[in-house]
Design a protein with these regions (language model features):
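Short solvent-exposed beta->alpha transition segments
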Residues: 30-31, 45-91, 106
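Structured segments of extracytoplasmic/periplasmic soluble domains
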Residues: 35-43, 51-55, 101, 120-123
Length: 139
């Protein structure tokens, strides 16, 4: 009887945890952030769109086509400066320094970009990005 109570408590609490969505934390977020930036750097916009929240994917791809980014946008460098996980582990803020050129301008631009990621459907997805070459394109 003495073992039965702790065992039942363990089963009940363990079952509750199994139904609570758990993010992968920073270990799961970092590769997503790196791969997203590599894909936009090498103009793999369709591959990069897989890291966006579903409601932003088509808008993002349409904007790339309309702006001829496969031809006119060159992301010359990026550096992830900071990654902060929200206390609940389901949201994250990523700060990146990005450098790019968009023709016809011959000037390289640099911006500190803040991106918001959300853990949804067992994956980290980019929800918002301010500044940078895609400023104003996320709802």
């Amino acid at each position: 009887m003495r073992l039965l109570v702790p065992l039942l408590l363990l089963v009940v609490l363990g079952g509750a945890c199994a139904h609570t969505p758990q993010s992968t934390g920073l270990e799961g977020l970092r590769p997503v952030v790196e791969d997203f930036h590599q894909r936009i750097r090498w103009k793999d916009f369709r591959g990069a769109a897989r890291y966006l929240v579903p409601e932003s994917r088509e808008v993002f791809l349409r904007a790339r086509a309309e702006r001829h980014d496969d031809r006119d946008l060159s992301i010359t460098d990026f550096e992830v400066l900071d990654v902060q996980l929200a206390p609940d582990g389901m949201r994250a803020t990523v700060v990146t320094r990005m450098q790019w050129m968009r023709l016809p301008s011959p000037s390289e631009q640099t911006a500190t970009v803040t991106s918001e990621y959300v853990f949804r459907d067992k994956a980290w997805l980019l929800e918002r990005m301010d500044e940078g070459p895609f400023a104003g394109e996320f709802p």
